[in-house]
Curated annotation (Swiss-Prot):
SUPFAM superfamilies: Radical SAM enzymes. It comes from the Bacteria. [4Fe-4S] cluster 2 binds at C157, C161, C164. This is tRNA-2-methylthio-N(6)-dimethylallyladenosine synthase.
Length: 442
């Protein structure tokens, strides 16, 4: 008899979304209840990410810890999913024969059958295939108690940037049908969700088939989602600059529910490095798109991703990146030292930059953007911000929510305001956090 499920998730928002779906699937099929205590669970699932270096090390370290639990309880079921499972399924089977289930991002809907096989046949069940996007046809209706929710609208990526493993672990771009996405949003809205975050590895490549034979792009999808009763905010992530289209920019003029925050990964400010990365644009094109957007939304917050120390990056290339950061004024960033992903084209490039130089460059970028974050937060003091109330604080004496530009905001108020957008006058700001006084409900 199995009762409790524990999931450990590494990586991106897509993995968080997938993990939530695993919970729904196994609740529906086996009535498993999620627990935050691995030692009390009957089923342990590890949802992995292969974007960063040492993903394998992280995986096998965690499995080593779980093997001790399995030694104490031979009936414990251990499963590995996600991108590392997709990439290294056979290696996982070889190195950790005590693992019962191995599945990829596109086969998580088959978990109930795989779990039954593991329970009944006592042998490892493995499925890391790429069956189009059929998993969405087999998922139970979403369930949530939150006022915010992710909705996956497409999977995979067809850009094949030289540094990126995603096309090899999640496959090429496949879009969910338009009506499937709309129906999921409607269900979530009926459960009290007020903010929807549309997800995809390359979300603005969305091309969802419609009943009339037409195809919806992301801009049209956003326009329709905004009309769904109860939806007050819309976000989307992650975007590629190449497909940040004029129609998508125009959506910021047409759809007030589309928040004034955009995450648009640039990776580098150097045209030479962008060519080596096979990004498909130059820095001037990136800046042009941001200028167009800011004509419509002058106050929009821009965040980005940066890869530091990509092979061939010299001082001039790094300076070009710093110049871009200064010109755009990024609010936040996810910045990492380049790490080789086996199987990608860039894995064959010579790693010709000293690690200390990479660390110094990373530190400078992070310091610069952290200063930007602090400066913007300080400028918000005295302003009135629209905050979506998400919950009460752990101490229970305040409410918290987020501004459109992703600032965590704390203020005193009644818990009946959860799920509402309220006006808050900002009184303090530090880093990514704000404090304020409640004014009125919108």
């Amino acid at each position: 008899m199995i009762n409790k499920l524990y999931i450990r998730t590494f990586g991106c928002q897509m993995n968080e979304y997938d993990s939530n779906k695993m919970v729904d699937i196994l609740k529906h099929s086996h009535d498993l209840t999620l627990t935050d205590d691995a030692t009390s669970a009957d089923v342990l699932l590890l949802n992995t990410c292969s974007i960063r270096e040492k993903a394998q090390d992280k995986l096998f370290h965690q499995l080593g810890r779980w093997s001790k639990l399995k030694n104490k309880n031979p009936n414990l079921i251990i499963g590995v999913g996600g991108c590392v499972a997709s990439q290294e399924g056979e290696l996982i089977l070889k190195r950790t024969p005590y693992v019962d289930i191995i599945f990829g991002p596109q086969t998580l809907h088959r978990l109930p059958n795989m779990l039954n096989d593991a329970l009944n046949n006592k042998k490892t069940s493995i499925d890391i295939s790429f069956p189009e996007i059929e998993k969405f046809d087999h998922l139970p209706k979403p369930r949530t108690n939150s006022v915010t929710a992710f909705v996956s609208i497409m999977e995979g990526c067809s850009k094949y940037c030289t540094f990126c493993i995603v096309p090899y672990t999640r496959g090429e771009e496949i879009s969910r049908p338009f009506n499937d996405v709309i129906n999921e949003v409607k269900i979530l809205a009926s459960q009290g969700v007020r903010e929807i975050n549309l997800l995809g590895q390359n979300v603005n490549a969305y091309q969802g088939s419609m009943n009339d034979g037409e195809v919806s792009d992301l801009a049209l999808l956003i326009n329709i989602v905004a009309k769904i009763s109860g939806i007050k905010r819309i976000r989307y992530t992650t975007s590629h600059p190449n497909q940040f289209s004029d129609s998508l920019i125009e959506a910021y003029a047409e759809v007030p529910e589309l928040v004034s925050h955009l995450h648009l990964p640039v990776q580098s400010g150097s045209d030479k490095i962008l060519r080596l990365m096979k990004r498909g644009y130059m820095s001037i094109e990136y800046k042009s798109k941001i200028r167009k957007l800011r004509k419509i939304r002058p106050d929009i917050s821009i965040s980005s991703d940066f890869i530091i120390g990509f092979p061939g990056e010299n001082e001039k290339d790094f300076l070009d990146t710093m110049i871009l950061i200064d010109e755009i004024g990024f609010d936040k960033s996810f910045s990492f030292i380049y790490s080789v992903r086996p199987g990608t084209p860039a894995a064959s490039y010579p790693d010709d930059i000293d690690i200390q130089v990479k660390k110094q460059r990373l530190a400078l970028i992070q310091k610069t953007i952290n200063n930007n974050t602090e400066h913007i937060s300080q400028l918000m003091i005295g302003s009135i911000q629209k905050v979506l109330v998400e919950n009460i604080t752990k101490k229970g004496n305040e409410l918290f929510g987020r501004t459109e530009n992703m600032r965590n905001t704390h203020f005193k108020g009644d818990k009946s305001l959860i799920g509402q957008i309220v006006n808050v006058k900002i009184t303090k700001g530090r880093g990514n956090s704000l404090m304020g006084d409640l004014l009125t409900q919108i």
